[in-house]
Amino acid sequence: MSLQVLLADTPEIREAIYALRYVIYVEEMGKSPPAADHQRRWIRDGLDATALLYAVQDEAGALVGTMRLNRLSDLRDPITQLTPLPIATLLERFPPAAISHTSRLMLLPAWRGGAALGLLFKRCYGDAAEAGIRVDLCHAKPGLVELYEQLGYRRFCPGLDLEGVGYQVPMLLALHDRTHLRDSRSPLLRFQASRQVEDRWGDGGWMASIAESYRGLNHRLVEPDEFWAAVGDALHEGEQEIPLFRGLNEEQSRVLLKTGTVLSCQPRDRLVGEGEPQHELFVVLEGVAEVWRQHDGHRLSLALLERGAVFGEMGFLGRSRRSADVIAVTPMRVLILTQAFL
């Protein structure tokens, strides 16, 4: 079935996008972002007024996906409007006209994992490059970090909590850093926009320097032996056995890890939030986390999680909402597995 990506240039299409966000974010995922309007059954916020909104339509004209792009030069006060994202850090190097922020990437379930995502990024990336954008900022839940890293995005700062969304990982893409796009085997390299402008500003080198402290491991971007060396021992050292790995030899375990990525976390990062609809499975590779839960108006510490410990398994296996907070106590590295792992 053929798809097309359109720029939403009428109030009707923009309102259809707001409604699609509500269907996916509230009705499907069970989230409750502050911008949700439950009477109109749509999600619209202050960034939409000046944003480029992209719509993916099937051959019948039905809306199946969307993405939003904001140029910081179009925002009245980007530092305030995009708080708590680290906008001030970017503005120290880049003029507002060279920075974009992409958000509200959503696809209906039937269209995930197919051509729709690639078409959205192709159009958005091309428009951004043509407009003079040098870096794009986004934020992703842990289970989507792997996807963005394969596109060429890099982690560059600690994770953060967003109201109504939960723990998010800010990520940056240097649009003209062809060396990193090539190293990431990014599909963006196939697009003409990636070849039109040289990185004469040295954005790739700057990105590499600030991203080094937050570099994790993505099984698709490193040699298999390097990835296994980082995660294999921890999978067998913890007191809590991972049922999905029970009885498997090393070769079989490696096959099952083909959706894994390793995330570096800082103290006080809230990896899992009580009541949040998340479906990732986490394995502690390094460091310590603490499990907290609200009970009768009091906050109780339930457990400490150390190397080899597993958390998030109930959400991973289908429970709709997380039953407790999991907060990093020390610097950590955690292996994240998504449901594609199954």
Segments from the language model and where they lie:
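Short amphipathic alpha-helix that is part of the acyltransferase structural core
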Residues: M1-I43, D48, L53-A60, G232-L244
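Cyclic nucleotide-binding regulatory module and flanking cytosolic helices
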Residues: I13, A208-P267, F316
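Conserved beta-strand in the GNAT
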Residues: A55, G61-R71, G315
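Glycine-rich acetyl-CoA-binding "A-motif" of GNAT/NAT acetyltransferases
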Residues: A62-V64, V283, V310
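Acyl-donor binding region in acyl/amide transferases
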Residues: R76-L175
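Conserved short histidine dyad/triad with adjacent acidic residue
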Residues: T261-E276, L305-R307
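Glycine- and acidic-residue-biased ligand/ion/polar-headgroup-sensing regions
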Residues: R268, H279-W292, R307-G308
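Cyclic-nucleotide recognition modules
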Residues: S301-L342
